[in-house]
C-alpha cells in the first residue's frame, strides 16, 4: 500500500463513483466546493493568519499585479523578480508543455513597502519554478531548459533570451522538475532534480558530452555552463546556511542536509558507503504539523469521507529556507522555515549541531510559525529581502494538488481552475520593526567598490550574498586588499566566511589567509579554511597547511574534525595516516566522520590498520563499527595476501571479541563482493580467502564455534548477535545450517530471524532453501519474515525450483509472489524457470486491475469492522509499511493515510502501479555471482549503490559487481492483494487505515 501523502506527487484525492452519482443527482459541480470555501480578498486573508507572537505579516503584492508566484529573487531594494507558475496544474503528465509561464519584475517606486509597478520581464515560457541572479540577468529553471534572461536596454523586458542548459525531464507533472537555482558560496548555481533527471547538454557547448542527471541534484558554472551532479535528491526546496552547508526538502522530509559529495566517496572505490544525506528533522509520520484550517481540505466537501480534523504531518514540504536577516528577532536568525502548502502553514525549526551534522525541531509543539484558516492559502516559497525581512510566496488557489494523482472519474468533482488568476506575496517582520541600516547604507550605491566591499560586513545575509556576487562578477583586483582585511578582521564570522569565498572567486585566496582562517575562533570559519586547505593538499600544494589541518583532527568541534578528515583524505603524506586513525577512534560512532576517514585510505590500508592498532582502546561500539567498515575496504580492495593476513590476525587476536567479529564480517563481505573473487561456486568465503588448509585450521574452527554460540545467545547484545548470524552465512551449510535453522523460530527477535534468512541465502545451498520453505516453518512466519524468505528464494537459480515446488504443493500461494518477482521469473534467462513460472502465474497475470477496483468499491459503503481491518493490516501490509509505529520500512509510512478519501486508499491498494513515485520504482539487479535482487534505490555513490529490498533490508552492491540493472517503472507492492483476504476484509482494512485509533 502506498499513500500519496508519502510520495512526491501530492495526496491522492479520489471520490467514489457512488458518491459521484449522488452528487451529480444533487447538481453538485466543482464550483460548489469553491462556494463552500470561497476565496478571500487580500485584505480579508490577512485577518485569517495566526502568526508567532511579536511579529506581523504585511501584504506586498497581490493579483492582478502578480499571479501564481512560485519563486522570487530581489536584485536590489524595491525590485523583485517573480516566477509565475501560470497554468498550474497544466499540463497533465504526458500531455505536452505549457507556454503560460512568465517572469514579472515588480517595483516599489514610492517606497511605501508595497509593489505598485509590474513589467512583463518574460512571457511564453514553460513551467517556470526558479530564479537566480547573475551578471545583470537571471537564470530561470523551466524544464526541459535552464534559460538566461537579461534586459539590456532598461525597459524592464528581457531582450536577451538564451537556453544555457537543456535536457531536463519535462514529461512529469509540474512539481517534479528541476528547480530552485541557488547561488552557493563557491560561485556555482545549485539546482534540485525535482526527483526526476534527464540528459543535460549545453547548446553553447555542443562538443561536451551529455551529463546523465539521475537520482542526484546538480550544479553548474554560471559562466561556462559546465554541469555536474551533486549529492542530494530534492523536490522543491534548496537552501544554504551562512557557512555554505546545503539543505533541501521533499514532501515528507522537511529538512535534509548534504554531508558528502560524489567526489568524496569516489576517492576510495572500495568504500561501500553510498549515503550522502542526513535527515535533520523528523520525517514522515513523526514530522508533525498543526494546521488551523481543515487539514483534509481536498475532500472536505464530502464530510462522510473524512475523519475528524487533527494535527497532521508534513505531506508537501517545500521552499525550505534558512533565514539570515535582521527583520525578525535574533532568535530567528539561522532558523529553518518550511512551507506546508497542503495544510496552509509555515513551520519554523531550530537547527542544533549533532555530531558532524545537524538536527532540527520546532521551538514548541502545538503551534506553527504561521498558519491560516483560509484553505486557499498555499505557501510554496520563502526568501529574504534587502530589508532583512522574511518574504513568502502564496500561490493562493483552491486546490494545490495535481489532477494527475486523482482518479480520472473523480477529477470533475474538484476545482483545479480556481486560483489561476490569483497570487500573493507577503513580508514578515517584527511587530515594531526598525528600518534596515543596510538598506539605507547600500541602496543605489552598489556600483561603488568600497561600498560593495563594506556590504560583506552587513548583519543581513542578503547584503553579504549580494556583495560577494557583485564583486566576483566585477572581478576588480582593487577589491582584494579590502576583502582580505574583512577576512581577517570582521566582527562577524559570517562576514569572514563571505570574504574568504569572495577571495576564492577572485582567484586571490592566498595560503597565509587560509592558514590564518584555520585558527579562526569560530568553527564555521575553520570549516571553510579546511575546505580550501583540502583543495590545495589534494593538488600537492598544501604542505604549509598540512600541520594545521592535522591539528584540526583534534579540534573541539565535531564538524570541524569531520571537515579535517575530508581535507586530509586527499593527501598522500604519511603523517596523515596516524591522524586519521586517532580521529576515527575518537569519532568512530559518527557514521559521517567514519566515512570521511575511510574515504582517504585507499592504497594505504595496511598503514592505517597499523596506526589504528597503536591507538588506545576506545568505546567498543565505535571500534566495532570502524573495524567492520575497514574490513570491507580490505576485502574489496587489498591483495589476497593482505586480506589473508588481515583475517588471520583478527582470528588470532586476544581480548574483546565483538570488534573481531565485526572486522571479520567486514572482510568476508568485502571479499565476497569483489570483482574476480570467483566465489559464486565457492560459497565458503573463509575457504576462498584462506585456502583449504587455512580453512581447516583449529583457529578458524574455534572462532566459528564462538560465532555460532554468540548468534544463539539470547543474553548477548542484539547488534553482536546480528553480526554473528551474518558471519555464519560465509561458512558452509554443513556447519551453519542447523544453528541458522534454529534462529527461524518464532521466539527469536524478528531482526535475528530475518538475518538468519539472509545468511541461508548467502550460503546458496539448496538445502537452505528447503529449510526455509518447510510447511511447518512457512506457516509460522510473520509477514516480514515471509517477505525475507520470498526475496531469498527468488534471488538465486538454485533456490527458485524449490519455491516452485512449494507453490505447487500448496505451501505458498501464487498471489504471495509480488508482481515484480513474477515478472522477474517470467523473464528469467533459464527456460525451465520461465516455463514453470508461466504455468504457475498464468491466472494472476491477466485481467484489468481497474476492473477489480470498480468491483470492490461498493464494499466501502457497507458496515466495517476496524479490529478485523487491523488484523488484515498486520497480516498483509505490515511487512512493508509502518502504521503508527508498527510495521516495516520497505515502503512509505502510511500513518497519515487516514486523511485521504476511502476510495483513494482502496485504489492504491488494488492498483499499486496506478502511480509510482520515481524514488519508489523498482530496480532489478543481477550481480556477477549470480544473485538477483529487486528493490528501490535508497542511496548511491560513484562506486556503489544501496538497494532497499522487499524484505526490508538494505543491500550495498559495488558497481563493479553489476551484470545488469533494469528499472521496471513498477512498484514493489504486488498486484492481487485482494486474493489474500476475504472481500469484506478489504473494506475492513480501509476502515482501519482511516480510523482514529
Give residue spans per PLM region.
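Long, ordered, helix-rich scaffold segments
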Residues: 393, 415-421, 429-872, 890, ...
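Bacterial N-terminal signal peptides that target proteins for export
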Residues: 2-17
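Bacterial N-terminal signal peptides
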Residues: 15-27
Amino acid at each position: 500500500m502506498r499513500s500519496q501523502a508519502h510520495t512526491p506527487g501530492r495526496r491522492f484525492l479520489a471520490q467514489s463513483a457512488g458518491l459521484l452519482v449522488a452528487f451529480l443527482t444533487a447538481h453538485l459541480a466543482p464550483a460548489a466546493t469553491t462556494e463552500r470555501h470561497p476565496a478571500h480578498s487580500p485584505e480579508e486573508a490577512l485577518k485569517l493568519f495566526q502568526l508567532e507572537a511579536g511579529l506581523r505579516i504585511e501584504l506586498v503584492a497581490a493579483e492582478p499585479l502578480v499571479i501564481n508566484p512560485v519563486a522570487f529573487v530581489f536584485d536590489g531594494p524595491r525590485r523583485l523578480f517573480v516566477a509565475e507558475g501560470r497554468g498550474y496544474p497544466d499540463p497533465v503528465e504526458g500531455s505536452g508543455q505549457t507556454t503560460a509561464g512568465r517572469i514579472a519584475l515588480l517595483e516599489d517606486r514610492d517606497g511605501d513597502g508595497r509593489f505598485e509597478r509590474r513589467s512583463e520581464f518574460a512571457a511564453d515560457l514553460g513551467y517556470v519554478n526558479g530564479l537566480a541572479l547573475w551578471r545583470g540577468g537571471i537564470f530561470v529553471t523551466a524544464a526541459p531548459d535552464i534559460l538566461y534572461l537579461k534586459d539590456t536596454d532598461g525597459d524592464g523586458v528581457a531582450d536577451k533570451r538564451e537556453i544555457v542548459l537543456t535536457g531536463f525531464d519535462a514529461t512529469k507533472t509540474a512539481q517534479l522538475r528541476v528547480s530552485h537555482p541557488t547561488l552557493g558560496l563557491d560561485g556555482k548555481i545549485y539546482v534540485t532534480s525535482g526527483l526526476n533527471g534527464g540528459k543535460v547538454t549545453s547548446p553553447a557547448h555542443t562538443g561536451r558530452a551529455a551529463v546523465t542527471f539521475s537520482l542526484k541534484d546538480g550544479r553548474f558554472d554560471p559562466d561556462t555552463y559546465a554541469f555536474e551532479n551533486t549529492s542530494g535528491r530534492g523536490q522543491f526546496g534548496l537552501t544554504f546556511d551562512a557557512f555554505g552547508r546545503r539543505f533541501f526538502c521533499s514532501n515528507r522530509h522537511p529538512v535534509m542536509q548534504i554531508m558528502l559529495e560524489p567526489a568524496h566517496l569516489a576517492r576510495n572505490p572500495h568504500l561501500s558507503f553510498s549515503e550522502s544525506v542526513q535527515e535533520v528533522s523528523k520525517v514522515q509520520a513523526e514530522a508533525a504539523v498543526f494546521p488551523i484550517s481543515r487539514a483534509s481540505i481536498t475532500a472536505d466537501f464530502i464530510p462522510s469521507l473524512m475523519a475528524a480534523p487533527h494535527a497532521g504531518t508534513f505531506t508537501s514540504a517545500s521552499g525550505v529556507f534558512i533565514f539570515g536577516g535582521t527583520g525578525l528577532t535574533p532568535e530567528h536568525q539561522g532558523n529553518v522555515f518550511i512551507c506546508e502548502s497542503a495544510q496552509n502553514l509555515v513551520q519554523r525549526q531550530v537547527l542544533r549541531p549533532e555530531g558532524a551534522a545537524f538536527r532540527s525541531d520546532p521551538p514548541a509543539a502545538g503551534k506553527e510559525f504561521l498558519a491560516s484558516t483560509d484553505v486557499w492559502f498555499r505557501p510554496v516559497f520563502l526568501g529574504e529581502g534587502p530589508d532583512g525581512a522574511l518574504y513568502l510566496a502564496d500561490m493562493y488557489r483552491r486546490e494545490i494538488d495535481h489532477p494527475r494523482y486523482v482518479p480520472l472519474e473523480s477529477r470533475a468533482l474538484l476545482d483545479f481552475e480556481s486560483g489561476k488568476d490569483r497570487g500573493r506575496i507577503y513580508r514578515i517582520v517584527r511587530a515594531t520593526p526598525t528600518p534596515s541600516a543596510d538598506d539605507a547604507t547600500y541602496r543605489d550605491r552598489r556600483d561603488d567598490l568600497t561600498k560593495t566591499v563594506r556590504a560583506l560586513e552587513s548583519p543581513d545575509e542578503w547584503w553579504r550574498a549580494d556583495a560577494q556576487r557583485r564583486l566576483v562578477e566585477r572581478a576588480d583586483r582593487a577589491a582584494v586588499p579590502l576583502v582580505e582585511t574583512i577576512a581577517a578582521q570582521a566582527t562577524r564570522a559570517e562576514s569572514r566566511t563571505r570574504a574568504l569565498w569572495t577571495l576564492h572567486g577572485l582567484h586571490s585566496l592566498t595560503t597565509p589567509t587560509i592558514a590564518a582562517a584555520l585558527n579562526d575562533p569560530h568553527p564555521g570559519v575553520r570549516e571553510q579554511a579546511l575546505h580550501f586547505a583540502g583543495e590545495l593538499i589534494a593538488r600537492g600544494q598544501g604542505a604549509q597547511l598540512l600541520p594545521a589541518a592535522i591539528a584540526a583532527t583534534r579540534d573541539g568541534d565535531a564538524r570541524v574534525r569531520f571537515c579535517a578528515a575530508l581535507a586530509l583524505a586527499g593527501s598522500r603524506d604519511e603523517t596523515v595516516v596516524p591522524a586519521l586513525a586517532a580521529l576515527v577512534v575518537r569519532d568512530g560512532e559518527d557514521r559521517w566522520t567514519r566515512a570521511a576517514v575511510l574515504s582517504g585510505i585507499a592504497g594505504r590500508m595496511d598503514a592505517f590498520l597499523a596506526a589504528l592498532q597503536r591507538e588506545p582502546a576506545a568505546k567498543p561500539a565505535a571500534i566495532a563499527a570502524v573495524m567492520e567498515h575497514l574490513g570491507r575496504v580490505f576485502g574489496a580492495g587489498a591483495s589476497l595476501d593482505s586480506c589473508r593476513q588481515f583475517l588471520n590476525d583478527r582470528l588470532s587476536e586476544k581480548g574483546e571479541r565483538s570488534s573481531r567479529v565485526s572486522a571479520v564480517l567486514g572482510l568476508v563481505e568485502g571479499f565476497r563482493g569483489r570483482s574476480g573473487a570467483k566465489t559464486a561456486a565457492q560459497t565458503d568465503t573463509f575457504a576462498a580467502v584462506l585456502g583449504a588448509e587455512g580453512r581447516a585450521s583449529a583457529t578458524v574452527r574455534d572462532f566459528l564455534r564462538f560465532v555460532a554460540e554468540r548468534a544463539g545467545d539470547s543474553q548477548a547484545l542484539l547488534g553482536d548477535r546480528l553480526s554473528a548470524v551474518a558471519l555464519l552465512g560465509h561458512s558452509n551449510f554443513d556447519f551453519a545450517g542447523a544453528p541458522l535453522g534454529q534462529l527461524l523460530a518464532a521466539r527469536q527477535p524478528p531482526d535475528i530471524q530475518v538475518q538468519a534468512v539472509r545468511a541461508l541465502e548467502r550460503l546458496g545451498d539448496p538445502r537452505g532453501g528447503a529449510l526455509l520453505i518447510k510447511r511447518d516453518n512457512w506457516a509460522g512466519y510473520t509477514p516480514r519474515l515471509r517477505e525475507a524468505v520470498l526475496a531469498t528464494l527468488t534471488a538465486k537459480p538454485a533456490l527458485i525450483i524449490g519455491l516452485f515446488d512449494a507453490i505447487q504443493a500448496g505451501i505458498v500461494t501464487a498471489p504471495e509472489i509480488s508482481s515484480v518477482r513474477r515478472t522477474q521469473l517470467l523473464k528469467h534467462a533459464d527456460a525451465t524457470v520461465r516455463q514453470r513460472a508461466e504455468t504457475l502465474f498464468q491466472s494472476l497475470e491477466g485481467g484489468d486491475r481497474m476492473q477489480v477496483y470498480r468491483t470492490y468499491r461498493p464494499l466501502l459503503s457497507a458496515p466495517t469492522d476496524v479490529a478485523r481491518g487491523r488484523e488484515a493490516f498486520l497480516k498483509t501490509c505490515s511487512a512493508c509499511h509502518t502504521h503508527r509505529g508498527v510495521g516495516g520500512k520497505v515502503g512509505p509510512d502510511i500513518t497519515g493515510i487516514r486523511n485521504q478519501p476511502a476510495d483513494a486508499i482502496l485504489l492504491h491498494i488494488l492498483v499499486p502501479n496506478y502511480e509510482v513515485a520515481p524514488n519508489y520504482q523498482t530496480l532489478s539487479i543481477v550481480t556477477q555471482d549470480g544473485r538477483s535482487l529487486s528493490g528501490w534505490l535508497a542511496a548511491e555513490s560513484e562506486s556503489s549503490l544501496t538497494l532497499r529490498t522487499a524484505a526490508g533490508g538494505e543491500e550495498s552492491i559495488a558497481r563493479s559487481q553489476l551484470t545488469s540493472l533494469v528499472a521496471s517503472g513498477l512498484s514493489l507492492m504486488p498486484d492481487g492483494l485482494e486474493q489474500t483476504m476475504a472481500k469484506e476484509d478489504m473494506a475492513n482494512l480501509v476502515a482501519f487505515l482511516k480510523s482514529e485509533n
